[in-house]
Amino acid sequence: MKVSSHEMVPTHEIIPREEIPLLLEKYNIKLQQLPKLLDTDPLVLETEATPGDVLKITRMSPTAGESTYYRLVIATSL
């Protein structure tokens, strides 16, 4: 079963690498300041994202309408 097909799971998409600097500039942050997602996360695996990719997560909120979040994919270290 695809995790993303569940109605409660927000949309996840990989931001093109060339757009990451624009995102960081827009929010005046550094890459490492983004919240993290492990490369073993089911949605990271489903989107085929790799460490260093940034995922754009779009979800609907009853109070705010559409909300967008960004997460940096990091490698799992054992």
Curated annotation (Swiss-Prot):
Pfam families per record: RNA_pol_Rpb5_C (PF01191)
GO cellular component, as recorded: cytoplasm; DNA-directed RNA polymerase complex
Top-rank taxon: Archaea
Assigned EC number: 2.7.7.6
Catalyses which reaction(s): RNA(n) + a ribonucleoside 5'-triphosphate = RNA(n+1) + diphosphate
SUPFAM superfamilies attached to this UniProt entry: RPB5-like RNA polymerase subunit
Keyword annotations from UniProtKB, A to Z: Cytoplasm, DNA-directed RNA polymerase, Nucleotidyltransferase, Transcription, Transferase
GO BP terms in the entry: transcription by RNA polymerase II; transcription elongation by RNA polymerase I; tRNA transcription by RNA polymerase III
GO terms of molecular function: DNA binding; DNA-directed RNA polymerase activity
Subcellular location, record wording: Cytoplasm
Enzymatic class: transferase
HAMAP family (alphabetical): RNApol_Rpo5_RPB5 (MF_00025)
Subunit structure: Part of the RNA polymerase complex.
Role this protein plays: DNA-dependent RNA polymerase (RNAP) catalyzes the transcription of DNA into RNA using the four ribonucleoside triphosphates as substrates.
Family to which this protein belongs: Belongs to the archaeal Rpo5/eukaryotic RPB5 RNA polymerase subunit family.
Name of this chain's protein: DNA-directed RNA polymerase subunit Rpo5
Source species: Methanococcus maripaludis (strain C6 / ATCC BAA-1332)
Designated gene of the protein: rpo5
